[in-house]
Amino acid sequence: MSFGVPPGSVLGPVLFVLYTASLSTVIEKHSVLHHSYADDSQLQKSAPPHQIPDLFLSMQKYIDDIKSWMTLNKLKLNDDKTEAMIVSSGRKSRSLSFSFPDFITVGCASVPLSDSVKNLGVTFDCHLTMKTHVSNLVRSANFELRRISSIRHLLSTDATKTLVSAFVLSRLDYCNSLLFGCPQYLLNKLQKVQNNAARLVLRVSKTDHISPHLASLHW
């Protein structure tokens, strides 16, 4: 093969990383931070508030350079799946004397600025409050608890604990270090999910104090 990576091969992911390694050279010449995971690449650029308009102009330049590199290497940038977000404190955003553009142009697509984006399973909002991530996490964990609850009468305690650990606690544990410093009311929402999980496993009444039961489960 002159271009690309053989699909379905065992070495495919490794070969793809090697194949796209030179992309970092194109990005770094613009002094842009970047992170890549398989075929997912993220670009990050910081600037003082008064330089935001210039930042958008330079952003368009290195996006065009990336597309040129991909065309040269017979790769296609998925314009429709590209996301963009401005991260700032809410207070500073409100104090700016100008408004942010509504979108950036990527190829033939106009990519609107998002209030939140998902990065490897973690949802980041534009003010890094983690509110959206916690809300999504609580919703998905409660959904799994309801599914397990519907068959709880068929399961032993150990089997229920295994299912809860696999489908609920694993979600709470994933990247939980990012929640350090979050307001207590957000952490309380996650604690409530864990409490409900313990009640489901041990068939504990809602009126019972949950701390001893969490300790017995080593949670």
Please name every model-derived segment:
Residues 67-86, 92, 189-219:
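Short, charged alpha-helical motifs in flexible N/C-terminal segments and linkers
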Residues 65-66, 72, 79-80, 172-187:
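Charged boundary/loop elements
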Residues 61, 72-115:
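Short, conserved micro-motifs composed of acidic
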Residues 41-67, 71, 89, 180-181:
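Catalytic palm subdomain of template-directed nucleic-acid polymerases
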Residues 8, 23, 39-41, 59, ...:
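Mobile genetic element proteins and their domesticated derivatives, centered on retroelements
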Residues 1-15, 44-50, 126-127, 149-156, ...:
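Short, conserved non-catalytic motifs in the polymerase core
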Residues 13-44:
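Active-site palm subdomain of RNA-directed nucleic acid polymerases
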Residues 108-179:
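Basic, alpha-helical interaction scaffolds
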